[in-house]
A protein has these predicted regions:
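Extracytoplasmic/lumenal domain signature
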Residues: 1-13, 20, 26-69, 73-167, ...
Length: 443
């Protein structure tokens, strides 16, 4: 993907926000206008909450709603605007974006869905979705009900480390599927998408390559918790991702179609868990948010908000900012770039507007709860949720000052999922069990 595509929609075959942060550069948030004084016009489901049981460290718990990263995909298909999203009821949902009504029956998986789905960018009626049931799936939505066309298990690959969920949002480029797993490996499949004689979409994925997201130096530094929860970023011919061991890496994929194996061309150890997705700017610099969990000496030296220059692999650190007020703090939200700023929400509930060139904090907002939701910015308006259950909009028109709040709406649960903005409506999932549509009230 050309750096000039940063901030642009993902091609022109399908109109919409098709994956977490909208594009392979993770830099497109939706389409305006942004509502000016919104109310909740519908919530999904209409009655029962989206809840199911899941096991955390061997203890069964009920989880509800939508969580991190939880951004719905929204797109135009057959004269309707669709929302597709996974939730903590362990199902994939297919919903009319205007009315909140089901377009297709729910598709059940075996455990909760934390990540954001990816809709095929080339117009095939396909959605790519991972679950905590250890499977990455391809579903079709061209019939009266969704069909499972393919699935792969996290332990179909070896060796693996740490875990077996699929929280990362995959990418599809030139009939290749790029998918990261909490099995700590990265996987590339040739999809072989087509249609059968009845006109229904089919796939026949073949594994092209898979490789570990760790190396022995990383295991020596931090141990085996090196799962990949970040969503992959593709910039030019380089694939970037990071892992729970804090290893930020770039892989050359230029020769993929000629059968040339990807090779690692960039390595930087951030010192601690990186779950937030890496974000590039139009000059090719990378912005990385790091958690503070292990209290390593490296994380104390490097900081939790980092700008890297991958064109200088021997000394890539441009600047860094410390954000470690307590153990298990730092950054979970994916940053957003707007004009001369990079914006980082924090676990402490602060939002830093940072000068992209100097690394100086220009302003800081104080929210009412931890901020794991990633900012969505359309038409100079930033929409962001927090764990007090509030979704707020801020005016970014003057980047030199703290942005004034334009409006806020409230849900009954933590908003750690990322919102999507589309043609006058903001869609956001909450841990209270519902997905909400907020738009201006029109009499």
């Amino acid at each position: 993907m050309d750096p000039e595509s940063i901030g642009q929609p993902w091609g022109d075959a399908v109109e919409g926000v098709l994956t977490f942060r909208g594009s392979p550069t993770r830099s497109w948030y939706g389409k305006g206008p942004v509502p000016e004084n919104p109310i909740s016009v519908w919530s999904f489901p209409e009655n029962n909450r989206m809840c199911s049981m899941t096991s955390i460290s061997g203890v069964s718990e009920q989880w509800c709603g939508m969580g991190w990263t939880g951004q719905p995909a929204i797109f135009k298909y057959e004269e309707e605007t669709w929302l597709i999203f996974g939730a903590y009821d362990s199902k994939v949902h297919f919903v009319n974006a205007q009315t909140g009504e089901r377009l297709l029956p729910d598709f059940p998986t075996g455990d909760i869905i934390k990540g954001s789905v990816t809709v095929d960018p080339d117009g095939f009626p396909l959605v790519y979705v991972g679950s905590r049931d250890n499977y990455l799936r391809i579903l079709s939505f061209d019939g009266e009900e969704p069909r499972e066309l393919w699935k792969v298990h996290a332990y179909d690959f070896s060796p693996t480390k740490w875990n077996n969920d699929w929280d990362s949002s995959p990418l599809v480029i030139d009939d290749y599927l790029f998918a990261a797993g909490e099995n700590s490996r990265f996987h590339i499949f040739h999809l072989n998408r087509s249609y059968d004689l009845e006109g229904r979409v089919v796939v026949s994925p073949e594994l092209v390559t898979d490789f570990p997201g760790w190396d022995e130096e990383l295991i020596s530094d931090v141990g085996s918790n090196v799962s990949i929860e970040t969503s992959p970023l593709i910039l030019g011919d380089t694939l970037y991702f990071a892992n729970s061991g804090g290893l930020v890496q770039g892989w050359d994929i230029a020769g993929l179609s000629e059968g040339i194996e990807p090779t690692r061309v960039f390595r930087f150890w951030a010192g601690d868990d990186v779950d937030a997705t890496i974000v590039p700017d139009d000059e090719g610099y990378l912005y990385v948010g790091v958690e503070y969990e292990r209290a390593t000496q490296r994380s104390k030296e490097i900081g939790q908000i980092i700008k890297l220059d991958p064109s200088n692999p021997e000394d890539p650190l441009v600047w860094s900012v410390e954000d470690r007020p307590y153990l298990n703090s730092g950054i979970w939200a994916t940053p957003a770039i707007y004009e001369d700023l990079v914006i980082f929400p924090t676990d402490q509930g602060k939002v830093h507007g940072i000068d992209r060139i100097t690394g100086d904090i220009r302003w800081t907002l104080e929210l009412s709860g931890k901020a794991w939701s990633s900012p969505a910015i359309v038409d100079g308006v930033m929409v962001l949720g927090d764990c007090s259950g509030q979704l707020r909009a801020f005016d970014l028109s003057d980047t030199s000052i703290a942005p004034p709040q334009l409006w806020r709406v409230r849900t009954e649960g933590c908003i750690e999922a990322t919102a999507v903005i589309w043609e006058g409506t903001v869609y956001a999932g909450s841990r209270d069990g519902f997905l909400y549509a907020f738009r201006d009230f029109i009499q």
